């Protein structure tokens, strides 16, 4: 379909199930496939009356459990945002696929528990190194090199490691095509309800 992905997607969407199945394939592939832009979706949250957005690496996607997993530094400002208001939107778009996927739901912060222990064990040394920096991300510094790590123990970074579990209740799928765009939304209330939308 696109130069960045080997997954097989429909050339046209005529059935609602196709849109949900394609979203599942795309996001499942994106967990390990860093060449697709869905590997780094935009996660938006609320800070007071402001919307705050950041790009994050997708670590896990599970459609059956309506779940996404992200990793972050527990000292980061976003932790407070998520704690005070856990309503979150996640959106990704890949121009090669001409597909946008938007999800809405709630996010939970895990720190120093079974969830973080398992995720930490599965993380590689390069990823763990990021959490060994003396200060958390977005802290003001005088020089650009003031955050550089010199001597550190990789495992010491665990105390700064946090896992974000995002449980979505809506998934919106948009496919752009000159012959006719297609947009669908899937909502999980008591049961799954799906419908087409005007693109």
Question: Regions from the language model: what does each represent?
Answer:
Residues 2-14, 100-199:
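Charged, gly/pro-rich active-site loop segments
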């Amino acid at each position: 379909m696109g130069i960045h992905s080997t997954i097989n997607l429909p050339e046209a969407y005529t059935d609602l199930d196709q849109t949900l199945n394609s979203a599942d394939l795309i996001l499942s592939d994106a967990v390990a496939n860093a060449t697709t832009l869905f590997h780094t979706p935009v996660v938006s949250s609320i800070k007071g009356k402001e919307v705050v957005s950041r790009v994050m690496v997708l670590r896990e996607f599970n459609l059956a459990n309506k779940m996404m997993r992200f990793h972050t530094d527990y000292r980061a400002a976003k932790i407070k945002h998520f704690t005070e208001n856990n309503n979150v939107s996640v959106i990704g778009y890949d121009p090669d696929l001409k597909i946008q996927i938007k999800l809405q739901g709630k996010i939970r912060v895990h720190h120093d528990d079974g969830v973080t222990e398992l995720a930490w064990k599965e993380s590689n040394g390069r990823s763990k190194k990021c959490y060994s920096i003396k200060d958390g991300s977005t802290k003001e510094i005088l020089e650009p090199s003031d955050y550089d790590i010199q001597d550190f123990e990789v495992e010491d970074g665990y105390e700064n490691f946090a896992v974000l579990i995002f449980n979505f209740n809506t998934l919106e799928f948009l496919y752009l095509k000159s012959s006719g765009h297609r947009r669908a939304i899937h909502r999980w209330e008591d049961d799954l309800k799906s419908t087409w939308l005007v693109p």
